[in-house]
Amino acid sequence: MRIVFQGDSITDAGRDRRNYFDMGNGYPKYVSEMLKKEFPNAELELINLGISGNRTCQLFDRLYPDAIALEPDVISILIGINDIWHRHDVDRIETTNEQIAVNYRAILTRLRNRTQAKIVMLAPYILD
């Protein structure tokens, strides 16, 4: 089973980007450790493709070269923190709530149309 983690710095979590099997120190690492412990005989391929600083529009742009092309069984996405957080930076372009919703729908639509993967969409905790 191939599981791909996509997102921003919360997913990236300091991973070594030269090695996409490096889980970093965030939730992908803990999920990976739990899965390996719970299913020790399962053939798991766990890939972290989080990129620190990414926004929803950037994740959308890299869905094919990153996640879809890998033909994962499961895609876990946690994105949106930077869309919200950077509203407070004077020199950043603001992403409205409406645009974030449009981007989320576009991400889900592209994944549903281009892959058979199960999608696990995690809400940015700042939105909960």
In which residue ranges do the predicted regions lie?
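Alpha-helical cap/lid subdomain in secreted, periplasmic
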Residues: 30-45, 58-128
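Serine-esterase "nucleophile elbow" of acetyl-processing enzymes
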Residues: 1-52, 64-71
